[in-house]
Amino acid sequence: MFDKMNLGDLGKVFEEIQERAKKLQEEQESKSFIAKSGGGLIKVTANGKGEIIDIEIDDSLLEDKDSLQILLISAINDVLKMVEEDKQRSALSMMTPDIFGQK
């Protein structure tokens, strides 16, 4: 993989990787993800950093604490999973063969 590169080229590759990583992080931070549970009775929104930024709860759940807790946990887990899967997809897309001089 690196046999046709000199150290100067390798430095450029690492610089490009850093630039792509920074751009990826900026793009990730601007994204938002929404998960619903209970047929939409609970809606949880997270940003691309995995921070919960909004929770909407239907009034009908306010009297049923057990259901509220179960549905809230489910929606939070779902939205965090969405964020993690997106991060992994983005990281893999950053590592294209052309970055190492391969085509």
Swiss-Prot record:
Record's function text: Binds to DNA and alters its conformation. May be involved in regulation of gene expression, nucleoid organization and DNA protection.
Principal location listed in the UniProt entry: cytoplasm
Molecular function GO labels: DNA binding
Domain of life: Bacteria
InterPro entries assigned: YbaB-like_sf, YbaB/EbfC
Metal-binding as UniProt keyword: no
Coiled-coil regions listed in the entry: none
Subunit structure as annotated in this protein's UniProt entry: Homodimer.
Protein name from the UniProt record: Nucleoid-associated protein NIS_0256
PANTHER family the record matches: NUCLEOID-ASSOCIATED PROTEIN YBAB
Provenance organism: Nitratiruptor sp. (strain SB155-2)
Subcellular location as annotated: Cytoplasm, Nucleoid
Record keywords: Cytoplasm, DNA-binding
Family: Belongs to the YbaB/EbfC family.
GO cellular component terms, A-Z: bacterial nucleoid; cytosol
